[in-house]
Amino acid sequence: MAEVLFASSAMRHGYTRQDFYEVLAGDYLKVRSQRGLEDVYELLGRNLDGAYLHVVYRILADRRLRVFHINRMSEAQRKRYQRHSK
């Protein structure tokens, strides 16, 4: 796995680095940025507590990942994730 950097903004909503790794360890959906940002991806998944999380990260030029957002999924994101998980 690539080295992962966490922006302070990633922790703004009370989630932690551990939550990010828990999403990666489970069943997640990876999509390109819904805002059309280059080299930015979104993960929809769950942590071990069962929270539905939305993670946004950028792939840096040196191939490291910079996570800058972790928060609960919106209702639309949750429905999309649940369709994927079936």
Positions of the model-derived regions?
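Ribonuclease/tRNase effector modules and their secretory precursors
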Residues: 1-86
